[in-house]
A protein has these predicted regions:
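RNA pseudouridine synthases
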Residues: 1-365
Length: 365
């Protein structure tokens, strides 16, 4: 009995696309599945589609075949070696093709990305809230990567690390193919010092609050696991880890630099109970798990202001531009892996919720 081969869509191999970028967007690559991998509707009786065009139309655009036809008409469906395919090109299982996806309408997102540092190897920018780092899901053109490739005229740009879409702050991009690996290894080996700023309630637990307000800060440990297709991470507190015999895999040092009790209207606007003091947090992650900082402050009973995932997932809706996640990638320091120069970067952005404190002080005076 022959087992079906798994469907394959390649992503990570460093192949040279046979199509140039279009408006900062790379073509996608797709390995044509074997008939036994396809549903009956695409391979009736176990027979492969007659042509590549038939397959692409049936799988992706059955209601608008002209989208695929137009790609073939403009020579924008190709093999690895650059061979231009036509609507009559036969379907060959295992063959890799390249083409441009059809872009859906995307809402216009912020484009202000001031340059914090640049040399011939690397570009550091100050990312705004709500702008994704890379194309993903419904955001393709409206991403930092796509916008920067167009703005800088550099199709080779790739991010060295990532920030969540709601998070603002310092973000690095490699400018050349040769620079990618040294900078990626720098992050992989944790040769980077990072701090974040956040605005969140002061922990209700007096001991946790006292430690967070101390010069040493509060060390938060937990075990975090990202579950596929689940928006929140799964997290065990340090106490739960001990009880279950599980090793913590995350560590953050959280220090509260200042506190401020907002007026009731501000508290209500941010979804925080009135009368509870807020803190300006300095967060130093010693590990780099998904949503680590957001999950750790939520674990303290002090979720970051503007968080739509913690403590509960809020319904989808338009971005709340007046109330973004109050999390900022504030500083990034490292020894340049190519030149050896010490580099220290700092975001020029501020957190809007904390600016309310400053405006309240000005109004009072």
């Amino acid at each position: 009995m022959q087992h079906a081969k798994p469907a394959r869509r390649t992503h990570r191999r460093l192949l040279t696309p046979p199509l140039a970028q279009k408006n900062g967007i790379d073509p996608i690559q797709l390995v044509l599945p074997h008939p036994e991998e396809l549903p009956e509707a695409l391979a009736p009786g176990g027979r492969a589609p007659a042509t590549i065009a038939n397959y692409l139309i049936a799988r992706f655009y059955p209601n608008d075949p002209q989208i695929i036809h137009s790609r073939f008409e403009t020579g924008e469906v190709r093999l690895d070696d650059g061979t231009v395919l036509t609507t009559s090109s036969p379907y060959a299982p295992g063959e890799r093709i390249w083409y441009f996806r059809e872009l859906a309408d995307e809402p216009e997102l912020p484009s202000d990305m001031p340059v914090l540092y640049e040399d011939e190897h690397v570009l550091a920018i100050d990312k705004p809230h709500f702008l994704p780092t890379t194309p993903r899901g419904s955001y393709i053109a409206q991403t930092a990567l796509t916008k920067l490739r167009v703005r800088e005229g550099n199709p080779l740009l790739i991010p060295i690390h990532r920030l969540d879409r709601p998070t603002a702050g310092v973000l690095l991009f490699a400018k050349t193919v040769q620079a990618r690996r040294p900078f990626q290894m720098m992050f992989q080996h944790r040769l980077v010092s990072k701090t974040y700023r956040a605005v969140a309630p002061v922990p209700a637990d007096p001991t946790a609050a006292e430690q967070a307000l101390s010069a040493e800060g509060l060390r938060v440990r937990s075990h975090i696991q990202k579950v596929r297709d689940v928006l929140q991470v799964r997290q065990l507190s340090e106490t739960e880890c001990v009880a279950r015999g599980v090793e913590p895999n995350t560590l953050t040092t959280a220090r509260i630099l200042e506190t401020f009790t907002p007026d009731p209207a501000d508290a209500e606007a941010w979804g925080v109970e009135p009368g509870r003091p807020w803190g300006l947090y300095d967060l130093a992650p010693h590990t780099g798990k998904t949503h680590q900082l957001r999950a750790h402050l939520n674990l303290l009973g002090a979720p970051i202001l503007g968080d739509v995932l913690y403590p509960r997932v809020l319904p989808d809706g338009p971005d709340r531009s007046e109330h973004p996640l109050q999390l900022l990638a504030y500083t990034l320091s490292f020894k340049h892996p190519i030149t050896g120069e010490p580099i220290s970067l700092r975001s020029g952005r501020t957190l809007g919720a904390w600016e309310r404190k400053n405006s309240a002080v000005r109004e009072a005076s």
